[in-house]
Amino acid sequence: MSKVKVAILGSGNIGTDLMMKLERSNILQLTAMIGIDPESDGLRRAKEKGYTVISTGIKGFLEQPELADIVFDATSAKAHIRHAKLLKEAGKTVLDLTPAAVGALVVPPVNLHKHLDEWNVNLITCGGQATIPIVHAINRVHPVGYAEIVATIASKSAGPGTRANIDEFTQTTARGIEKIGGAKKGKAIIILNPAEPPIMMRNTVYALVEEGKIDENAIVQSILEMVKTVQSYVPGYRIRTEPIMDGNKITVFLEVEGAGDYLPKYSGNLDIMTAAAVKVAEELAKHKLAAQTA
């Protein structure tokens, strides 16, 4: 089978975990890892594995644009705004793992099929990837007037990129809850928990559905079906208890355990982003290859 060439921009935690996940892909061929710190663990590992290593950032990649058709940006929201412009000019498809939200917001099981021709796809945030599918699952049965999510992650799993993007996290996640989840109003809260040993990523979804006849069984069934769908590409994603129904208020408790590729298993918040990124890139690649043979 033909493969589509991809490169990773950003050699931190997310970029390095992504590198390990891409090695298992049957349709994506990782060619290069791009960073700005030649001493970073990510670039060191990429060099050991035989990938092209660029330590001069995006400038270095643009000198060898033939290295990849799809570029994963695992840097920061502010950096992505600059990168997006340059990569668009170079004719690249971009998968944005920062909360910059320059391109189309995508949650794979909800709306990926609508955005297969986009040049820039944004994966929102870890909290968004974990909770928006649940908001959507409720909303497809009964309209959601308000949805609030609380994402609690281990302090140790929050690197400098995550910490620099807290404001963007809350804004972009809330936007995704509304635009993709379907809630009329959305709100997002992130909590960094310093507990030792580090906790798994936990997410709580609170949804207020509009007044009227509520089919509780249909809502619960829809949520459980969505959990199974997300598990197809994030095996450590699970619901901790049955959804709690209280009048028109629905509460769902979720947990995300990482695959333990590069990051510890408690870093489910980072793992769900890299797993979603690979899923999206594989579908974009299939679409590109199908268009070439059509």
Curated annotation (Swiss-Prot):
Keywords: Aromatic hydrocarbons catabolism, NAD, Oxidoreductase, Plasmid
Active site annotation, chain numbering: 126 (acyl-thioester intermediate)
Residues that span the membrane, as ranges: none
GO biological process, one term: catabolic process
Catalytic activity field: acetaldehyde + NAD(+) + CoA = acetyl-CoA + NADH + H(+)
Annotated residues for binding of NAD(+): 11-14, 157-165, 269
EC supergroup of this enzyme: oxidoreductase
EC number: 1.2.1.10
GO molecular-function terms, A-Z: acetaldehyde dehydrogenase (acetylating) activity; NAD binding
Protein family according to the UniProt entry: Belongs to the acetaldehyde dehydrogenase family.
Protein name in the entry: Acetaldehyde dehydrogenase
Organism in which the protein naturally occurs: Geobacillus stearothermophilus
